[in-house]
Amino acid sequence: GRTIMDYLNNGRWSAVSVGRVMTCVLGMVVKREREIRDFVKTPFYRVIGNFGYEGQKFDGEWRAVKGSQYFESHLLYKENGFNKKEDAQKLIDELKIEPPAVKAVICKAEKKKEKKNPPLLFNLAELQNTCSKLFKISPDETLKIVQELYEKKLVTYPRTDARVLSTAVAKEIHKNISGLRNYALVRDIASGILEAQSYKGIEKTKYVNDKQITDHYAIIPTGQGFNALNSVTQTAARVYEVIVRRFLCIFYPSAEYLKINITAERLKESFFASFKIMTKEGYLAIASASFAKQKLTDKQAQTTEGSADDAADNDNKLDKNAIEKIKQLKKGMEIDLFSAEIKEGETSPPKRYNSGSMILAMENAGQLIEDEDLRAQIKGSGIGTSATRAEILSKLVNIKYLSLNKKTQIITPTLLGEMIYDVVFASIHALLNPELTASWELGLTMVADGKITEEEYMMKLNSFITNHVQNVKSKNYQNLFKPYFDKAAANYKTSKKTAKKTTAKSGTDNSKTKNKQA
């Protein structure tokens, strides 16, 4: 603590707050920020062909597949673009496109049906992530809202990790649906489900699974307490509607699509086009909340980089007549190639965490663990619990290790947070990784299974703490950290003087709370 305070010209002692969960979360945020900071954007150039058939135009993306003169060429950025613009232009010139059009031949035309099932029900983490996106509120605020809804008997117990129902609840689920007929926004939907009896057999679906429930089943509406709904805030009322609609969706059929993939060839160069046509709206008809600005769509956001797995997206360009013409396309048919153009893009860095995605990252932290046995130990539970994750994130913000943009809910480290990270990285590196939590959880499991005694487990734990504390005390970090602190500080507009005031306040708060560990 003194090393950090000296660097900030404060000179006061200040305890450093650490914990097996909170320090791991700090590490995740700092690592992500440094990945973004060090990322070097790479430009690339895709070639898009403009095709037509009986008056209907559509785009196709060129790829260097087998048979192309550019197959596995060093000139490529992946298989669907070039590193240099002049190489992309050379390809266009080689296609010999002359007005008004030249011919291309369809060498593959695939049509297949796809289904999109209703999502699983909300657990707390998934609800916090959704509310962060929809309402730009923190996980802590979401927890307070859903706790209020629970206390008013509007929803079931909120601090749950499960996204499914229990068999016992499924048998009585018609009561919840029946109660929702008193909720004006979904009255007709609830009545329709009851009349069709589509709730019957729900226990045989993926939405009911006793094995996936540890303490409590998913968050669902009780179908009661509607008088209390008038006394909650607008945001709370909207959160309730989101929970209700997610619940009712599982009693609706899947959305259905016709996926058409076309491959057209011109002078041995292949272009790919895809069309995704909704044939049955299914649950999407009721999924969109009444306050939403626009209807839910199933279209996934395109990445800046583009994907080699997806051909040119034509989903939003088709009317009924166009759809019928596209359906007629078959292997061996000739279509028009009017032109080709270069679309410039650039690689993009990883995204910063927002408050919702951070909660999900904590829940899914096991994915970051390479060791299979350790990964299995926290699979399905992650780091922290549904009841503590929001609190841990809030604490990191309160002690000024992390910064939360209230408008966007984006999370970034502070200068102090990065300095703490560097100190922990050099002294007790294990605290920054979920492997530590997983190994401790594994030890607890071994105690429960009788493979080791409680005394043996505590001995190993005490040994870990003692050894690392002695290691920190035995080394002089005063001069070691300055280059790291300088490097981090260069990325912050805040002067040391401002940082000094902030950190001094943080240090005072820490001493009062005695640094309770997460």
Label for each model-derived stretch:
Residues P158, K200, A255-K259, T263-L267, ...:
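GHKL-family ATPase ATP-binding module
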Residues A430-K500:
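Non-catalytic DNA-recognition/assembly elements of restriction-modification systems
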Residues G19, P43, S274-I286, S290, ...:
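Glycine-centered small-residue hotspots that permit tight backbone geometry or close packing
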Residues Y70-E72, G282-I286, D422-F425:
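A short, polar/proline- and glycine-enriched secondary-structure boundary/capping micro-motif
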Residues G11, V164-N176, A236, S274-G282, ...:
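Short secondary-structure boundary/capping segments
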Residues F82-E241, F247-F251, A255-K259, T297-L444, ...:
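Structured DNA-binding interfaces in DNA transaction proteins
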Residues G1-A101, C107, T214-I277, F485, ...:
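Phosphate-backbone binding and catalysis cores of DNA-processing enzymes
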Residues T23, A292-L296:
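Hydrophobic, well-ordered secondary-structure scaffolds
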